[in-house]
């Protein structure tokens, strides 16, 4: 007798999951952690440029602007913004000849 004759083929009504341990707290916790991880990974991939620019430039405080005229403050803001705009960050283009 070959192995092929002993293999059971599932019928359509037997394809449902009948797990007896699906209400186990460890399984529930693992499912929740997995779903949260997937959501965070998707958000990271969608908004990575925005998030990492904010972390790189947004958390750094510049020098104090007390007593500095408004025109110089605006010039400083424009310089900082142009520095952020120039940095596209994570990708390198390599051209082959």
From Swiss-Prot:
Q: Which residues lie on this side of the membrane: Intravirion?
A: 44-97
Describe activation and inhibition of this protein: The M2 protein from most influenza A strains is inhibited by amantadine and rimantadine, resulting in viral uncoating incapacity. Emergence of amantadine-resistant variants is usually rapid.
Q: Which InterPro entries match?
A: Flu_M2
Query: Where are its TM segments located?
Result: 23-43
Q: List locations, semicolon-separated.
A: Virion membrane; Host apical cell membrane
Site features described as Seems to be involved in pH gating, chain residue numbers: 41
Where is it found, in Gene Ontology cellular component terms? host cell plasma membrane; membrane; virion membrane
Please state the protein's primary subcellular location. virion
Q: How does it sit in the membrane?
A: Single-pass type III membrane protein
Stored Gene3D superfamilies: 6.10.250.1640
Attached lipid, kind S-palmitoyl cysteine, located at 50
- Point out the annotated site residues (description: Essential for channel activity, possibly by being protonated during channel activation, and by forming the channel gate and the selective filter): 37
UniProt-recorded Gene Ontology molecular function terms: monoatomic ion channel activity; proton transmembrane transporter activity
| Written domain comment of the UniProt record | Cytoplasmic tail plays an important role in virion assembly and morphogenesis.
Additional observations:
When the channel is activated, one or more imidazole moieties of His-37 probably become bi-protonated.
**This protein's name:** Matrix protein 2
Q: Which organism is it from?
A: Influenza A virus (strain A/Chicken/Hong Kong/96.1/2002 H5N1 genotype Y)
Q: What is the lineage of its organism?
A: Viruses, Riboviria, Orthornavirae, Negarnaviricota, Polyploviricotina
């Amino acid at each position: 007798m070959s192995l092929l004759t002993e293999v059971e083929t599932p019928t359509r009504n037997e394809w449902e999951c009948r797990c007896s341990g699906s209400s186990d707290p460890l399984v529930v916790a693992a499912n929740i952690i997995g779903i949260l991880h997937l959501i965070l990974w998707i958000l990271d991939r969608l908004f990575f440029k925005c998030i990492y620019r904010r972390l790189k430039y947004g958390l750094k405080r510049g020098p104090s602007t007390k007593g500095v005229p408004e025109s110089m403050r605006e010039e400083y803001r424009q310089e900082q913004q142009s520095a952020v705009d120039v940095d596209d960050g994570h990708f390198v283009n390599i051209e082959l000849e």
